[in-house]
Structures are given as C-alpha cells and as structure tokens.
Amino acid sequence: MRSRYDEAYTRSLRDPEGFWAGVAEDVYWERRWDRVLDDGRPPYYRWFAGGVLNTCYNALDLHIDRGRGKQRALVYDSPVTDTIKTFTFFELRDEVARLAGALRRQGIDKGDRVIIYMPMVPEAVIAMLACARIGAVHSVVFGGFASNELAKRIDDARPRLILSASCGIEVNRVIPYKPLLDGAVDMAAHKVERCVILQRPQGPAALVKGRDLDWNDFVSGAAPAECVPLAATDPLYVLYTSGTTGIPKGVVRDNGGHAVALKYSMSAVYGMGAGECFWAASDIGWVVGHSYIVYAPLLAGCTTILYEGKPVGTPDPGAFWRVIAQHGVNAMFTAPTAFRAIKKEDPKGVHMTRHDLSRFRTLFLAGERCDPDTLLWAREHLHVPVIDHWWQTETGWAIAANCVGLGMLPVKPGSPTKAVAGYDVRVLSEDNQEMPAGQIGSIAIKLPMPPGCLPTLWNNDAGFEKSYLVKHPGFYLTGDAGYRDEDGYLYIMSRVDDIINVAGHRLSTGAMEEVLSGHPDIAECAVVGVADEIKGEVPLGFVVTKAGVSRSDGDIVKELIDRIRQQIGPVAGFKTALVVKRLPKTRSGKILRGTMKRIADSQEYTAPATIDDPGILDEITDALKGAGYAKDRP
C-alpha cells in the first residue's frame, strides 16, 4: 500500500485549520467550535475555541450509545496479586459514573483539582475518568513518590481531595503508600480537605479521623453523575514532569485538542480500530499511561490493558508474551528498557516461542532513545514491525513516528522516522539557523504546535516561556539534540545537555551508546561526559553484560574501546568503560546519566525522586572509585 503520510503531513502544515477540523469530526461535540485555532495571543494558542464536549463521554458513553457497551473496555492483569479482571464499556461507565457522583456529593465541581496517588489498579483509571466526567482537573502522581515530592505537587495544584490507596505491590514487597501520603499532607502548606483511601488486603492502612474516608464507604449510595459539558479549552489534567527540582512543572492538557489528537493518533500512528486490543506497558503516573493506557484507547473504542507487573520477574521473561497471547493484544507500546531487560534474561527469545502471538502485529517503542541493536533483536524474534517513535510529556502524543495507519515508510533502525502531522520540526543551530542534513543541532518545533500539546504550565506562564520558548523565538524547545538525514528521517541522539565537548569536538553520547550496544555481549549501556584537565571532557562508558556472559571484563572493555575507535574515530577520546551489574534508572526506565556524571566528577547530587532503586548509586560510586573517579565521595 502506498503511504499516505506525505499527503497528510503536507496538508497539516499548509492548512492546519482545515486538516484538524476534518480530524475533529471523529469526536462528539456538544457544540462545535467557533474557531479551529485561536491564534490571537501568541505564543498561547488555543485549539477548537468555543467548542464544547466531554472527554469521558467520548471515551465511554459514546461507544455504549453506538452499540458497543458489551465490548471489553479495560482488562486489569496483575501478576503481583494473581488477579485478572475485565470491564465492559457498560461496567466501566457505571463504575466511573458512581465515583463521579461520590465526588459531586463531596462538593467537588468543575475546575476543582483532585490528586490521584495510586498504584496500577482499576480504581486509578476509574478515578481519572470520573474527574473528566464532572470537569474536575486530575493530577496523577506516581504511586510511591516520596512525601516531599508529593507535598510540592499538593502545594502547586492545591487539590480539594486526594484519591489514594493503602499500598502498592512490587515483585517481592509491599510499599505502604499511606505513611507517604500522611507525610506529604503534613508537609504541604495547602491543606487538603479529604483523602479517600482504597484499602488493599496486602497492606491495610489506618485512617485519620475527620480527614480520611474508606473508598467503598465514599462511593456507597452515590447517585451516578452525568457528563458535564466543558469548553474545549478547559483543562482536563495537570501532570508534573518527573525529576524536577524546586517547584515542579505542571504540564496542562486541555479537553478538546487532547481528545482530537489522541483519537487521531490511534488510527494514524498506531493503526488501531475500534474493538481491537492495545497495551501500553507503562504506569498511569507517566504521560504514556495517561495517553495510551487510559484516554487514547478508550476514545478509539479499543480494549486497553492495565498491567500491574514487570517485564521480567513476574514470573519470568515471558510475562509480556503471556499477556499478549491471553488477552489478544494487537499492538503494544513500551520502553526500550523493558526489552533490554527481557533480552538480558532471555537473549535467544525462547519464552516468545511458548505463547501464541498470532494476533500481535506491531510493537512500538518510546520513552528513551532506542538503540538499533534492541530494535533489531525485537524484530528478529517477534517477526512483526518494531517502530521507534519519539515524544514528550509536554506534547502528550507522538512528535515523530512511522505512521502505521497511513502506510508504513521504510524503517531505519535508530530513527523514529519522520514528524507526525501538525509538527513542523526543525534542527537548529545556536543562532537559530537550520542545520544541514547529517549535522547535529537542537530539535525544535515551530509554533503553533498541533492539538494535544501543552498550552502552558499550571499557573506558570512565565515558567512556560522560560523553559520552552526563549531559546529559539517562535519555536518550542524540545531539549533534545539530533539531526535529519538526506531522506528527511529524524535521529534523536541525546538530550542537548548530553552533547559533550572533547577537545573542541562536539560529540553525541547517544552515538557512542549505539556503538557499545551493538557489541554481542552487551545488554545495555550508558555514556556520560566527565571532566578532564586536558580535553575539557572525555566520554566514560557504563555497560551491563547479558546473562550467561563469562568472558573477562578486561577483554570486553578492550573490544568496546576498539569499536568506538573504529566506528566514531580516535577523536571521541573513548578510553574507559566500566562493567557494572545494573544502571540507575527512574521508575519509567530513563537512565540517570546526569547523576552518574555528577558522581564521577565528585559533585554534589540529590537522588531524583523518581529513582527506582537508590542502592544502585552506591554500586556505581564503588565502580567509579575503582577506576579513579569519584575521588571525593565518602
């Protein structure tokens, strides 16, 4: 099939209002918009101004009204509790309406903020949709976040109510949430009126009299709430970016542009249709969970999977394949980190052969840069297209992708292909000139961005402009560095901060990681720039070997140094690599390169609130000391 990508992309830039007006016809509107794009106050653009709709209605009630109420809407699969539960659209709508009614009974109204601090349980999805139903603005905070980080979000969002749970459950441990919540509520200057607690049998919590309510008691007897008509430009949610310092940045998502963009993405980018099954193996605390566990699949009339488990360890590296086979997943979206973990434990893909994956047709990777070796390994063993794509919390959906629904373009490993409709992506120099093909620059998006992207930060227009708009006037700064090739394919090499200067040569650590990950013994890797008296900076590699590798570290490191020298050149100055057991990551799978760099350079650092296991930093420190770095660390 000839790809319709070029036609769609060209029209979206030439006639954005006509293009998006056509796309928006797929969404149910209580009242049509007055203007597709209100550009009267740049850089603050508003999509579908004057339009009225309800996101929850479009995600649930619309499908019931069209005769699909008995279709599976949500499948909860929890290997950590040995639970599988399925909700039809009828059942999910009824649960959502009842919780929405309980919120209304508590006095929660349109525009009020509600923080959701919960694990991966159906009640978390129900809570998000219940807020959307009545126009309350939800702010989901990753379950288990430290008290001080949760307190910052409470003070910024100023919620009237918090929906939470007694505990979260990991592979081998129960994480009590209630003490963290209590600590945050005590720390916060803003005083929360009510906390509603879902009691999980694995770790019940004591309730604070006069403030806390049991979830079941809260919902009991509540009259179901109908959907509230909302302006397209009204906020749907606020999601705070992870790993921030000081006051966190609250990314705002509107109702209208969000619904239009996400429903479009399900068909155009992911090639999904109503009645099919989509699985985003992420967490609702991250943007992937918001967009592709909750909103986009349901807006598109798909079945969505809510997975409370891990890629390995619940119980083995075949966990993903069991879920795909058991629930008939057609397309999956996860982070490359998950596949590196699977590849490390099951390098020959033996577990894949034990499950019927005949209905599975596409794998999508995003969340961090995908090295070609991981992509090719997944493609070789799964025998389906493996599509790397690129986007951010701020955009809420893909900036660049190989759009399956428009007809795939040829895959180039290492590239997320080309910009998606509506995104006018440029590669810019420091002085705002476009870079020639093949040369690395700062990746920026010409304003206005398409529907679904952040209109601003929560109560922080000045921070919005400073963070994203000042560096390249007229453009949104992605913070990523990369280049375009001769065919117009984008390559995202690293964060702008990860470009290192070795004796005056600007080099991408991402390019070096690509070379290291291609070594047959390497499961995953990271490269950071460390201070050097002579060259200013030099690259330092960290590598984790695959399961079963028994060769000496010295031999492997020598080969890695030779690979960099051959494929990038002596100019890279790559002379040191450390073999470690594991790399420090956030809970969403992003490698903490900046923290490793600060440890190596003996600088002060604070472990990010999003870190998965702080103990790994001690292991990294010991490895660095053994190589002569981190000299001033205790």
Where is each model-derived feature located?
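Conserved AMP-binding/adenylate-forming core of the ANL superfamily
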Residues: C56-Y57, L74-L129, A146-A151, L207-D217, ...
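Conserved pre-ATP/AMP-binding loop-to-beta segment of ANL
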Residues: K70-R72, C195-L198, V208-Y240, I247, ...
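Structural core segment of the AMP-binding/adenylate-forming
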Residues: L129, R133-D217, G328, P336
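AMP-binding/adenylate-forming catalytic core of the ANL superfamily
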Residues: V141-S166, L181, A325, M332, ...
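AMP-binding/adenylate-forming catalytic domain of the ANL superfamily
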Residues: E193-Q199, Q566-I591, Q603-R633
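Conserved AMP-binding/adenylation subdomain of ANL enzymes
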Residues: A259-C277, V287-A331, K344-V350
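Gly/Ser/Thr-rich phosphate-binding loop
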Residues: C302, N330-T334, K343-P410, D424, ...
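Conserved ATP/PPi-binding loop(s) of AMP-dependent carboxylate-activating enzymes
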Residues: K418-G422, Q433-Y468, L507, E604-Y605
